[in-house]
Regions:
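Catalytic-loop region of hydrolases
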Residues: 5-102, 243, 534-537
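Extracellular/periplasmic catalytic domains that process cell-envelope and extracellular macromolecules
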Residues: 19, 29-32, 85-89, 121-124, ...
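N-linked glycosylation sites
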Residues: 22, 56, 72, 112, ...
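Serine-hydrolase-like catalytic core of hydrolytic proteins
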Residues: 40, 75-234, 263-299, 455, ...
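Non-transmembrane alpha-helical segments in soluble domains
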Residues: 117, 161-164, 168, 218-222, ...
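Polar, glycine-rich mid-to-C-terminal structural blocks
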Residues: 234-253
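Substrate-gating cap/lid region and adjacent catalytic-acid/histidine neighborhood
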Residues: 248-451
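Alpha/beta-hydrolase-fold serine-hydrolase catalytic core, especially in secreted/extracellular enzymes
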Residues: 444-538
Length: 538
């Protein structure tokens, strides 16, 4: 989770310090960006399979907390595991980056939040950037009756909420304004922030089961951990060596995530927003054109014929009625040349040749399937959320990221898919990273190092800064030279971020592509996401 905070005044020190409610924090000065960094600051304690607890440690001026290096990351599978990050249960920490006027030397790409802070100073709207670690997988989102009865479900969300509270209480010590906090990608209490940015992840588009639907997975994990006969199974798991528990958790084939527990999540979020039970703040949200590539790649199923695509849908959505699947197949024709984006392929098409060249499987209906799953997971939910937010009379700004950051030859990014405007492709542009520079671990694709994409990165970055600072992405330093990004309720349109190698291509599109198909996805969200749970109208 990221948060941005407007800066109230400039401040710096050769060894910067801040006095928080827990005492003195000492950071490090980064001369290449003229910034102060405070890294790995604990914001809560994380007892295993229990709710987060406030920090009870104090630091005095003579023995300050050393915030000169990143802290541990929370246990999770995939990128955290494969890319050499230091994982630990002691992981509830955050990082703060703020401007500090001083002269420096060459750039260091390690600090990927530094670019957006640097740009905010150039735009004369300085801000602080805060990134937050929170618990993941089973340790962050345990399911089953035992977890629900103990009140320890959705722990990762509770971590986020406590982090936001810590920021509210302490950000003034770092020069920030607690009344001007914008949350990016997270959910928390409404009194804690004044705006939100949601990219490629919304209130629908992912399974959100009830707690008891996770019981079989919990029982399997308990059995493999030799805790079946324990009177208190949770306490037994708390006492199990992590070296035993961690591989078990990753081997049982259960995707641990948020659950409808009747407590933190009392009902499906889509219905809460529909009924107006949400934090009423300005919202900036958007999707990438090729969001579905990651879903098809993750499925390991690459259809060549319509009956194979049918199997993919039936497997992915077992509660979806066959008549609905037939409707979807009709609305995503095999010959998708006129669709947006086009997805018509054959086995000998350049796409599949390029996929095979890097030892990735392919099928002639790969892009057709990706269009379906991309609409389900991102485009339909993004449109639905923009519509709901606008109906509440709230400022809503919707975007569509179309720039292909990579193309053919294929560059495969583990966990994301084969390039193009795929899931995560916009991240380097939002952060304002220069062309060719990505995150320190090179997990997400870098901004393309050509003039058109460098201009695109700067434009997205400054729009994000304006939204954080002014709650309006049009409040730019040179706004008269820029295309107007209209609110969704006045235009039903998306602001399109696109570029060729040579030229920036900003424009506005009517938000009606694949409208009928997207509506079917949203009409059936109770069956795709909520296990046939259809809440009562209120």
């Amino acid at each position: 989770m990221l948060t941005y905070v407007a800066l109230t005044h400039g401040m710096h020190h050769p060894s910067p310090t801040a006095i928080t409610r827990n005492g003195t924090i000492r950071g490090v000065y980064l001369p290449s960006f003229q910034q102060d960094l405070f890294l790995g600051i604990p914001y809560a304690r994380a007892p295993r399979l229990d709710n987060p607890k406030p920090i009870n440690t104090t630091y005095d001026q003579d023995a300050p907390f050393d915030a000169s290096r990143y802290g541990n990351t929370c246990y999770g599978f995939g990128s955290n595991e494969l890319l050499g990050l230091t994982q630990s249960e002691d992981c509830l920490n955050l990082n703060i980056i703020r401007p500090a006027p001083a002269k420096g030397s060459s750039a260091d790409p390690m600090w990927n939040l530094s670019y957006i802070v640097q740009r905010s100073v150039q735009e004369e709207q300085p801000l602080l950037a805060v990134s937050v670690n929170y618990r993941l997988s089973f340790l962050g989102f345990p399911g089953g009756r035992e977890a629900q009865n103990a009140g320890v479900t959705n722990l990762g969300f509770k971590d986020q909420r406590l982090a936001l509270a810590w920021i509210q209480e302490n950000i003034v010590a770092f020069g920030g304004d607690p009344s001007r906090l914008v949350a990016y990608g997270g959910r928390g209490g409404g009194e804690l922030f004044r705006g939100a940015i949601a990219v490629s992840g919304f209130v629908t588009g992912a399974a959100l089961p009830k707690t008891d639907e996770m019981q079989a997975g919990f029982d399997k994990l308990v059995g493999m951990a030799n805790c079946t006969m324990a009177e208190d199974k949770l306490e037994c798991l708390r006492g199990t060596s992590l070296y035993n528990l961690y591989p078990i958790e990753g081997s049982i084939g259960v995707e641990w995530g948020p659950v409808i527990d009747g407590d933190f999540l009392q009902r499906p979020p889509a219905w809460e927003i529909r009924d107006g039970n949400c934090v009423r703040v300005p919202l900036l949200l958007g999707s990438n054109s090729d969001e579905g590539l990651i879903k098809v790649t993750a499925s390991g199923y690459f259809p060549n014929r319509t009956n194979e695509t049918t199997v993919l849908l039936e497997t992915s959505f077992p509660r979806l009625q066959h008549s609905v699947i037939k409707q979807l197949l009709d609305l995503y024709p095999e010959d998708g040349k006129r669709e947006a984006p086009p997805y018509s392929l054959s086995p000998d098409f350049a796409w599949c040749q390029a996929m095979n060249a890097v030892s990735l499987p392919c099928g002639s209906q790969y892009r057709r399937s990706a269009a379906m799953l991309g609409d389900y997971v991102s485009h339909a939910p993004r449109r639905y959320m923009a519509q709901l937010w606008s109906r509440l009379g709230l400022p809503t700004y919707s975007f569509h990221f179309k720039a292909a950051t990579t193309g053919i030859p294929i560059q495969y990014f583990y966990g994301l898919g084969p390039g193009f405007a795929n899931h995560g492709a916009e991240l380097a542009y939002e952060m304002g990273l220069p062309g060719g520079i990505s995150t320190p671990i090179q997990f997400y694709p870098p901004a393309k190092n050509v003039s058109g994409h460098i201009a695109l990165s700067k434009e997205m970055n400054r729009r994000w800064i304006a939204f954080v600072s002014r709650k309006d992405p049009n409040e730019l330093r040179d706004r008269n030279l820029s295309l107007q990004w209209r609110e969704y309720n006045m235009s039903t349109s998306n602001f399109v971020f696109d570029a060729t190698d040579e030229d920036l291509n900003l424009h506005v599109e009517t938000d009606d592509y694949r409208q009928q198909a997207c509506q079917i996805w949203m009409d059936n969200v109770a069956h795709t996401d909520y296990s046939d749970h259809v809440p009562q109208e209120t």
